[in-house]
Amino acid sequence: MKKKKKLRDFPQITQFLLFLHFKTHLTMIETPPTFAPTADTYNLIKPLLSEGFLQKIQNEYLYWSQLKYKAKDTAPEQLWQAVKLYRRLNERTLQFGKYQFSYVLTDYIQQALHSFDMHIGGTLTSNMGIAEVDTHKFMVSSIIEESIASSQIEGANTTRKKAKEMIQKGTKPKSKSEQMIMNNYNTMQHIVQHKHEPLTPESLQYIHQLIAYKTLDLPEEEGAFRTHNDIYVVDFTNSEVVHTPPDAAEIPVLIGQLCTFFNTDTHTFIHPLIKACVLHFMIGFIHPFADGNGRTARAVFYWYMLKSGYWLTEYLSISRIIKETKKQYEKAFLYTEADDNDLSYFITYQLKAMEKAFEALKTYINRKQKEIFQASQFMKIAGVNDRMAQIIKIIYDDPERVLSIKEIENRFLISNHTAR
């Protein structure tokens, strides 16, 4: 009998999904039935379409373990065969190395893509009715929020308040958790400043170096592709491996193809948001680094979104939504791999997370607009400009507060000279 691998048997275990297992105690997902359509399978598709049942299943993009409970007048296995066949007939394929992936442009996905094109393809000013002078404040706050949330997904346990104060005041990180958050903040700033540059293996390694700085057991692994296969994604409840990344020898070719995918248009048009989701997933799938793959994947997602002209991405904290729905985030990865690398599960999840992030941004802006209006009252004082008014408002709200020059620099992203 083959001995089960336990957590202690793995020299290095990636935190990309491991922390999600520790926190949520997920069990292994159920494997779907083998795809084996018959003549009856084809005959079943038409009535399912006419009833609108199939469209609903597609828009939610149900996995086998969810779909089987929807069967009414047919056996669950037969329903799965029909749904799977319909997906196969409408799929688009992608190839990375020896691995083939697919995705389906469901009605929901197409509607979401159109909505994002309408709302996040411009600027904060044009889309949200915010004065140009205020956009900088929202960007700084959003970078901080994204940095904190992306680190917390991977297990950073510092509170949001403490982490925000650390970044704004420019104090040195005092723990690994704080270092992770500071690293993410520096990475986000780097991406915003270099968003138009191409992705290369070297630039991906540099992103990882920024993300992993002083957080790995082996410092030499910062910014270095792994050269070993001691990387596993493990289900904590039973210590079973749920994902084994490609062999380390495959990494150069896979990353090279991923960079080409990032930098150039494919022969068949792929919507930029779909490409961003694929890039996010593929970094997690390849696991090119010993650790920090999740943070790197989310950073590359943001980079591609900004490169593609979706400027409002700078103001969205998608990782905060992912942190709140990390069980679904993990399952989106697992469903994709378990169901013949069907990326539609992950794309659907990611677009829904973006929708929630956009709604959260609108709520945040409405609240901040009221604060900005209150701060603007101080501008009636002779010689007080917008930035000064904000500082006065902070002190007015908290008379005990002491603002250092460093905190003003970080809060407003300005030089030391201007802060003084």
Placement of each model-derived feature along the sequence:
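FIC/Doc superfamily catalytic core
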Residues: 2-291, 295-420
